[in-house]
Amino acid sequence: MFIESFKVESPNVKYTENEIHSVYDYQTTELVHENKNGAFQWTVKPKTVKYEFKTDTHVPKLGVMLVGWGGNNGSTLTAGVIANREGISWATKEKVQQANYFGSLTQASSIRVGSFNGEEIYAPFKSLLPMVNPEEIVFGGWDISDMNLADAMARAKVLDIDLQKQMRPFMEHMVPLPGIFDPDFIAANQGSRANHVIKGTKKQQLEQVIKDIREFKEKNKVDKVVVLWTANTERYSNVVVGLNDTTENLMSSLDKDEAEISPSTLYAIACVLENVPFINGSPQNTFVPGLIELAIKRNCLIGGDDFKSGQTKMKSVLVDFLVGAGIKPTSIVSYNHLGNNDGMNLSAPQTFRSKEISKSNVVDDMVGSNGILYEPGEHPDHVVVIKYVPCVGDSKRAMDEYTSEIFMGGKNTIVMHNTCEDSLLAAPIILDLVLLAELTTRIQFMSENEGKFHSFHPVATLLSYLSKAPLVPPGTPVVNALSKQRAMLENVLRACVGLAPENNMILEYK
């Protein structure tokens, strides 16, 4: 059974006019390596820690500024949200299609809330806590191309023509602000699009971005702004002592107009200085150490890296399944070809390297979790190839071969072909990222040993489910297994309304 909404009734939960307050018993374990009777052994000790959560239930008017607004992802997301808001339908060769949010965790997935008369009861994910309605978002942003959003949508060739015709009147007046362009960080083939750029030194560019954010917020009368990078993949920035390793050095390098500060890092610095959440949707190392330090000092949310939408999402499920089943993956070979502008930019070796790193690290935690299958330091062979094939456009092809060792030296091979509609998969992920980032800023919590409430760590691990290479606080383990990432996000939000984590034991039926 599916229900649209619910309210928790419990002595541990209190709803007021402005907030939801919950008391939550967090059950975990601690391990001790101790000497007992002359021999060291591991002892696991269950423990319970009491937490309190409070969530501000005032849903703000939200502005979303996309870096690369006129790209495939930005134009597709903007058109999709408007189409949903206006209730637009359009004819395809198969049927009359209604606008929807399929592919969005917050808008199109469900959670289990319990059982009733022997039947499982589910509710929308978005019913857990008050979230921004996507159709009330005000969109804006920057682009190095001056093309309006209607023409950008046509250039992208993602949406059906009948839908594009209906969307044009809503989008032709939407024009991105000039963007920061540095040809040293992206492929040379992107130069032909760069007719709409912010001039000046890096510090002047930073100041212009800050000015743009302030003016957007004032003009549109929004309460909050979230900025997300959905522009070209950049090459990796060199992390150098004295350049960007500390906040002080990073800001000094900015004053000196150092060449190694990337455009994405400039946008992120601007957001942190304005206390505006910034999310990196591409694989480059935007968050250099000095920037992470700045975000932590100013308690400003940052998240990333790289949208997890197609091939990598499948990989994080399949490898988790294989290792969890006691099967040993020994080789993972991933081949991609795509024909959109992302593919053209990735045809340059330096930008491809950023994507290769992002895609290659996705299985590390799963391999490291099983010391029966893998010796220390042992790892499957893992190769990632990406090629630019203009003919396929936004319909990225992903082909994977997984070779595994099974019982008694046997071999198992799984071959998968995945046609990933690149922007149609990424757009709802962008939506989820900005909605969850905004929600995160309204939640505070404390443990029984702390004296006051505080926000989550500025490095937003709650967004890991949506990120190919999750950004985590220094010293924090990286989790890539998709089921664990989703469970973490859902269970934290459940705790905010006093619900136990979903453990799937269902003892009442055993």
UniProtKB/Swiss-Prot annotation:
Enumerate the catalysed reactions. D-glucose 6-phosphate = 1D-myo-inositol 3-phosphate
Protein's UniProt keywords contain GTP-binding:
no
Name the Gene3D superfamilies for this protein.
NAD(P)-binding Rossmann-like Domain
Needs which cofactor? NAD(+)
Q: In which tissues is it expressed?
A: Expressed in siliques, leaves, roots, seed endosperm, but not in embryos. Highest expression in roots. Confined to vascular tissue and hydathodes of leaves.
**Which EC class heads this enzyme's classification?**
isomerase
Please give the pathway this protein is involved in: Polyol metabolism; myo-inositol biosynthesis; myo-inositol from D-glucose 6-phosphate: step 1/2
Say where the protein is mainly found: cytoplasm
Q: Which compartments does it reside in?
A: Cytoplasm
Its keywords, alphabetically, are:
Cytoplasm, Inositol biosynthesis, Isomerase, Lipid biosynthesis, Lipid metabolism, NAD, Phospholipid biosynthesis, Phospholipid metabolism
The record's Gene Ontology biological-process terms are: embryo development ending in seed dormancy; inositol biosynthetic process; phospholipid biosynthetic process
Q: Which GO terms describe its molecular function?
A: inositol-3-phosphate synthase activity
Domain of life of the native organism = Eukaryota
Alphabetical list of Pfam families matching this protein? Inos-1-P_synth, NAD_binding_5
UniProt note: phenotype after gene disruption: Lethal when homozygous.
Q: What family is this protein classified in?
A: Belongs to the myo-inositol 1-phosphate synthase family.
Functionally, this protein is described as follows: Key enzyme in myo-inositol biosynthesis pathway that catalyzes the conversion of glucose 6-phosphate to 1-myo-inositol 1-phosphate in a NAD-dependent manner.
Q: What is this protein called?
A: Probable inositol 3-phosphate synthase isozyme 3
Q: In which organism is this protein found?
A: Arabidopsis thaliana
